[in-house]
Amino acid sequence: KIQIIGRVQHIKKGKLKNMLNKQEELILDGCHSEVSSKNLAKYLRQLRVSNKIGIFGILKSRKKEASKILKNFKGILKKIVTVKIPNEPNAMNSFDLRRMALRHNFEAVESDNIKDALKKISTKEKKIIVIFGSLYLVGNALSMN
């Protein structure tokens, strides 16, 4: 089995996983194109957990692609938490990403960073949390973990 870091990567342990309850799963995927987001959406659709929440951040250079990416998760993700990729001057801000998610009829909220986003959405309810939209965002998550 081949595993590519940052592509449908299940986080089983570490600081980020420790912030969550035991029944919450954490997945990272650096999908930053329409095609790669379709693959992630297909994978998430197969998972038997109904409550799926996304943490989304992307670069400004992918702005046109961002709307197409979000569209692929309609009916899959119940909520989107938008974040600006830390220490990345070319990152879209969370406000604009939230507006984009709202235009696609997602429940959407902004967050300052990944840790803040996880605090906002972690509950005792069984769920899958997927951090996606940029390899930079996934890299940031991995460095924090």
Where on the chain are the PLM-derived regions?
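C-terminal helical cap/extension that packs against the catalytic core
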Residues: N21-I27, L70-I128
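Active-site-proximal loop/hinge segments that shape catalytic or ion-binding/gating pockets
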Residues: S134
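Nucleotide phosphate-binding/pyrophosphate-handling subdomain across enzymes
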Residues: K1-K79
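Short, active-site-adjacent cap segments at secondary-structure transitions
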Residues: L137-G139
